[in-house]
Amino acid sequence: MKRPALLAFALATPVFAQPSALMKYACGPANRMFATLSAVSVYSDGHAGFDLNTLPGFTGQSCTSDKPFFFSVPVAEGSYRVTVVLGGDVPATTTIWSEARRLSVEKVHTEAGKSKSETFDVNVRVPEIAGDPAHHVRLKPREIGSLDWDGKLTLEFNGDHPSFRSISVESINPHEPTIY
C-alpha cells in the first residue's frame, strides 16, 4: 500500500473516545492500585466517599455495617461498569441498590473471610442537556433532591451485615447502546 493511500485510510477511519481511567476504592491496607477508604472518606463535590451521613465500620480488609450505608462517586453523565468485591471478616448477605433504588445485586451471601465479585452497569443522568446549556430536563417535585439527576453514582449497601472489600468504576464506551 502506498503512503498516500495509507494516509487516506487513517484519516477516514473513525476515532472513538476511549473510556476514562478506572476509579478504584478499597477498604483494606493502603496500596498504589486503589484509593484507600477510611472513616474520613466522606463524599464531597469532587471526592468519592461515604454519603448521606452513613459510615460503615472498617475491619482492616472490608467496610461493613449492621445498617444500610451509601457510597458515592462524582461522575459525568453516562453509563458506568461497576465491579464490587463483596465479603468481610463475618458472614454477610449484601444487596446493592444503585442510584434511586435500582436493584443491582440481590442477596449475595459471603462466608467469613471469603469474597465474591459482582459486576453491573449503572446509568447516571443530570438535568442539563449536553451541548445546550439553555435547556434542561424539567424535574417533577418528587425528583428534586433524589439520588437520580444529581451528577454522582450512588450505591446503597443493604442486607444482613452488608460488606465489601473494593469498588471499581469504569465508564462504558459512549457508543455502546443503553437498553432499558
What are these regions (language model features)?
Residues 18-180:
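Compositionally biased, intrinsically disordered or flexible polar/acidic segments
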Residues 7-8, 52:
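Intrinsically disordered, low-complexity segments enriched in polar/charged small residues
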Residues 1-6:
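Bacterial N-terminal signal peptides that target proteins for export
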Residues 9-17:
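Hydrophobic h-region of N-terminal signal peptides that target proteins for export
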